[in-house]
From Swiss-Prot:
Pfam families: DPBB_1, Expansin_C
InterPro entries linked to this entry: Expan_Lol_pI, Expansin, Expansin/allergen_DPBB_dom, Expansin_CBD, Expansin_CBD_sf, RlpA-like_DPBB, RlpA-like_sf
Membrane topology: Peripheral membrane protein
Sequence similarity: Belongs to the expansin family. Expansin A subfamily.
Transmembrane region(s): none
Signal peptide: 1-24
Protein name from the UniProt record: Putative expansin-A27
Keywords: Cell wall, Cell wall biogenesis/degradation, Membrane, Secreted, Signal
Length: 255
């Protein structure tokens, strides 16, 4: 991406944030810190199970959510537009700063610290522990923590939805990633060559499980996002698939 395109993208993000601020009721107060180092390498992996965030299409604009936001993994993949609250911490906010992040991890509570003195992710606090590169789009490094305003926004992804089939023997653990629209998944079903549609259950994060023992069968998936859109992904994995393989599709969600 050229410098002009990058500048245009930043400008569009900022304009979207500032225009949206006019509808103040849509914005929710929270706080934000950062982790993972200045290169963001420490944010790879995480409680959503995405692993390498570059490979899965999320990159460094990511965040770990406090328990109140993470919702036992149901928020994995959701996108949030975040701006620094200049009314509360003007000198610690970057001018015209705004960033959109994807939920990729859980920021666990720290019960050894008070919620207003280091236990930023303790319930019922709404808190984003962002990658440092993303956080520095909105806050001055020395601040460490800033008050923010956030709102859910539509996720934009390159390419189609991806399925990684993990597990062993009669246990399939399927990671659903690179989801646009709502970003998060509400339900997944799977069908083999010799079965009807089987409802899968969330195992952890963005991983969905089945105990049907479908090894050796071509796999199709039906996915419903939290926005209510359903897409059928026909014959995603061929009969000879192996555990650990990732399959990309050409279909993508709008909401």
């Amino acid at each position: 991406m050229g410098a002009m395109a990058e500048n245009l993208l930043v400008l569009c993000t900022i304009l979207a944030a500032r225009m949206a601020l006019a509808a103040a009721d849509d914005w929710i107060p929270a706080t934000a810190t950062f982790y993972g180092g200045n290169d963001g390498s420490g944010t790879m992996g995480g409680a959503c199970g995405y692993g390498n965030l570059y490979d899965q299409g999320y990159g460094l604009e990511n965040a770990a959510l406090s328990t109140a936001l993470f919702n036992d993994g149901a928020a994995c993949g959701q996108c949030y537009l975040i701006v620094c609250d200049t009314d509360k911490a003007g000198r610690w906010c970057k001018p015209r700063g705004a960033v959109t992040v994807t939920a990729t991890n859980l920021c666990p509570p720290n019960w050894a610290l008070p919620s207003d003195g280091g236990g930023w992710c303790n319930p019922p606090r709404r808190h984003f522990d962002m990658s440092q590169p993303a956080w520095e789009r909105i806050g001055v490094y020395r601040a460490g923590i800033v008050p923010v305003l956030y709102r859910r926004v539509r996720c934009w992804r390159r390419g189609g939805v991806r399925f990684t089939v993990g597990g062993f023997d009669h246990f399939e653990l399927v990671l659903v990633a690179n989801v646009a629209g709502s970003g998060s998944v509400a339900a997944v079903s799977v069908r083999g060559a010799g079965t009807g549609w089987l409802q899968m259950s969330r195992n952890w994060g963005a991983n969905w499980q089945s105990l049907a023992g479908l090894a050796g069968q071509p796999l199709s998936f039906g996915v419903t996002t939290t926005g209510g859109q359903y897409i059928l992904f026909q014959d995603v994995a061929p009969a000879g698939w192996k555990f650990g393989q990732t399959f990309s599709t050409s279909k993508q969600f709008d909401y």
